[in-house]
């Protein structure tokens, strides 16, 4: 019974947009204030989004990892609905789109914080949608848990014209689904790499920069359950 909840759970589809240094450098110089000593903290960031059964955003946040390089404060620029310190008990102050953490005389070497925001989702390199069928008949995702037959999961990735030209031309999209071999009768996923790891079948799809792709996963089962999709968007090159 517990496995049925996987389909109905909030984490049905998760999206991870990882911003490597090349991407972070498209917004950087204004993102960190140099201190009077000339010390400049540096950071990496990642955008995380939780989506519903069909690809609609339910929650999003930016997580930033700062290396302080001896600085005793950081000032970050970004519009966040809320800010969470993931490192220590240091409180933040916010003025407009500027968030400041002042660490006093004992700054950490590395500092992490989360800024809740949905804004980056609108400019991801792809728009994402999913739909479902049971034995060839369109079905609501919420109705599929525990069903018998062939379940089709249709994935649609369309380049987003609202994304920056850099993101559209440089980011790849990787989509992954995992199925327990003991719980399924058959698995078909054209255009995917399917790997067997222990009793798990891992389905991997890839979209190259600027590509529109439509993929289908077909699962034969007597008792359908699905842990969801994990999506990763990263630059095609890290140089």
Regions found by a protein language model. Give the residues of each.
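Cytosol-facing boundaries of transmembrane alpha helices in integral membrane proteins
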Residues: 2-239
């Amino acid at each position: 019974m517990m496995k049925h909840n996987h389909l109905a759970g909030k984490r049905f589809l998760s999206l991870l947009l990882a911003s490597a240094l090349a991407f972070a450098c498209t917004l950087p110089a204004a993102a960190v204030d140099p201190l009077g000593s000339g010390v400049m903290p540096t950071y990496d960031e990642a955008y995380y989004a939780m989506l519903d059964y069909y690809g609609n955003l339910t929650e999003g946040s930016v997580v930033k990892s700062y290396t302080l390089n001896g600085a005793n404060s950081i000032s970050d620029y970004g519009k966040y609905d809320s800010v969470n310190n993931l490192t220590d008990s240091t409180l933040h102050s916010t003025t407009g789109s500027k968030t400041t953490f002042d660490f006093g005389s004992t700054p950490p070497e590395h500092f992490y914080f989360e800024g809740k925001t949905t804004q980056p989702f609108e400019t991801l390199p792809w728009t994402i949608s999913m739909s479902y069928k049971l034995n060839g008949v369109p079905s609501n995702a919420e109705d599929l848990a525990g069903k018998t037959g062939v379940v089709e999961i249709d994935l649609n990735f369309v380049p987003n014209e609202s994304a920056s030209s850099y993101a559209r031309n440089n980011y790849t999209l990787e989509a992954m689904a995992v199925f327990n071999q003991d719980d399924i009768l058959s698995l078909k996923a054209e255009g995917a790499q399917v790997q067997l790891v222990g009793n798990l079948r891992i389905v991997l799809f890839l979209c190259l920069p600027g590509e529109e792709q439509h993929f289908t996963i077909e699962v034969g089962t007597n008792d359908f359950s699905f842990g969801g999709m994990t999506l990763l968007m990263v630059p095609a090159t890290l140089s």
